Amino acid sequence: MHIAIMSRNKNLYSTSRLKEAAEARGHVIKIVDPLKCYMNINMNAPSIHVRGEELPKFDAVIPRIGASVTFYGTAVLRQFEMMGTHPLNESVAITRSRDKLRSLQLLSRKNIGLPVTGFASKPADIPDLLDMVGGAPCVIKLLEGTQGIGVVLAETRKAAESVIEAFMGLKANIMVQEYIAEAGGADIRCFVIGDKVIAAMKRQALPGEFRSNLHRGGSASIVKLTPEERSTALRAAKTMGLNVAGVDILRSKHGPLVMEVNSSPGLEGIEKATGIDVAEKIIQFIEKNVKSTSSKTKGVG
């Protein structure tokens, strides 16, 4: 097959591993920087161009779209879809999962475990908002943040009020969540492909830090999932309509709670922690599913 990988940097671990795994299985790979693409949108022969050249027809496309280029990246992916290229994850599913508030609303509708979350636009609502999530300590998150950036643990009510007021003063969209103390600064990344959790790792924050993201110095180790955790991860990915997803779960006294569903999960941490060839499993999934070029939107909302 001819497969395009949408990525801004061919040297990134995930991009290079996917290319390596696909070529090892006999496929022809082209890495396409979505920001270098421009589109001809018409009713007869829609096309994508880079530097004056029209891109050839691809059988499948693997989107590795960073959060900062979601708008343009998903526009390019939609164009691939219009041209009949099979997407690993569909543009509508990626857009859905990138909206943190919308994704939590969709998950709650499916009765999937979540931390209690509050959202408001007016400073006058802050006291009631904090009461909703159980007071301090609480977690305040920028809706546009990634990799733990824009996430604040407010340990006192006064600190929470000050941080929320500051963010609101900057016209930033934020949500406030209950702090799950029993998680102990750890979360679980479940790597979902299709209808299976093919790998899972526990990410532990550094001492004195509550964000367990590996980009923030957290450590990763292999973990055994409970049946409920496995089921929660699969249901969360399905609700978003994602074929491949990284589902982040906290272990709480109320059972597993979903923090986020990532449409472009990194491969380095999970492959090194578990020893599983995740890249090859993604390519195998494409091989089994690319026969149907009709793009069907999964999930609701």
Curated annotation (Swiss-Prot):
ATP binds at K141, E178, Y179, D187, R211, S212, N213. Its cofactor is Mg(2+); Mn(2+). Its EC number is 6.3.2.-. Pfam families: RimK, Rimk_N. Binds 2 magnesium or manganese ions per subunit. Mn(2+) 1 binds at D248, E260. GO terms for molecular function: ATP binding; metal ion binding; ribosomal S6-glutamic acid ligase activity. It is an enzyme of class 6 (ligase). Belongs to the RimK family. This is Probable alpha-L-glutamate ligase 1. The lineage of its organism: Bacteria, Pseudomonadati, Pseudomonadota, Gammaproteobacteria, Alteromonadales.
